[in-house]
């Protein structure tokens, strides 16, 4: 057994908080304008119809409607289908 703790053990012992990334509103859910749909790093999902992209690649609804996930040109996209008034 070592009688010293080791060279770096006193410099360890920290961890970063999780970033809470991922899909926040799933397909078929009704959303209002401005609601966050996906939090991501990079464009894992691309913005589609009625969806905007923030500076940190967050996707958000630009109008009220129903969330739809799909594909366009081999990319995963998120669309908002408008609510029939």
Curated annotation (Swiss-Prot):
BP term (GO), one: translation
Pfam families: Ribosomal_L27
Keywords: Ribonucleoprotein, Ribosomal protein
Gene Ontology molecular function, alphabetical: structural constituent of ribosome
Keyword check for Nucleus: no
Gene3D superfamilies, A to Z: 2.40.50.100
Disulfide bonds: none
GO cellular component terms, A-Z: cytosolic large ribosomal subunit
Superkingdom of source: Bacteria
Entries under PANTHER family matching the protein: LARGE RIBOSOMAL SUBUNIT PROTEIN BL27M, RIBOSOMAL PROTEIN L27
NCBIfam families: L27
Similarity remark: Belongs to the bacterial ribosomal protein bL27 family.
Stated name of the protein: Large ribosomal subunit protein bL27
Organism: Mycobacteroides abscessus (strain ATCC 19977 / DSM 44196 / CCUG 20993 / CIP 104536 / JCM 13569 / NCTC 13031 / TMC 1543 / L948)
Gene label: rpmA
